[in-house]
Amino acid sequence: EQVLFEVQRYSLTVASELRPGARPNDAQASVSLLLEGRSVLPGSPVQRARLQFVDGAGGQRGARLADDGALLVINYPLALLPAIRQMLDSPGTDYVQGRFYGNGLIWADLHSAPVPAAD
């Protein structure tokens, strides 16, 4: 199965959470981007992706479909947030892609359309 959509808008969310019964210094913060657009593949229900950013090497999960297959969730290291924001804010078209193979392999990415080389 393949998911491919053109990014038309995005929103940044910075959140903080303190679970019931936790100590005040156990609050956790998160950063995510919600990307929305239009599918490039006929019949694909996925037109949104949530990029979740994780601080440090631990805690990374593989890409997955959520919300009954309508949302692609991709995890990236927090260090990539500035590069991804720059990519989204630059002129040109950006795409989100997800590929789910029968052997269990999952590939997901955010990429830009080819840019002509300067002469």
Stretches with model-predicted labels:
Residues 19, 40-42, 58, 103-105, ...:
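Generic "edge-of-domain/loop-turn" microfeature
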Residues 51-74:
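Extended, solvent-exposed segments with strong compositional bias
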Residues 71-118:
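Short, compact, well-ordered microdomains
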Residues 1-55:
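OB-fold ssDNA-binding interfaces and closely related basic DNA-contact patches used
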Residues 25-35, 60-64, 104-112:
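Short, well-ordered strand-loop elements centered on a beta-strand within folded domains, enriched
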Residues 1-14, 64-69, 113-119:
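Surface-exposed beta-loop interaction hotspot
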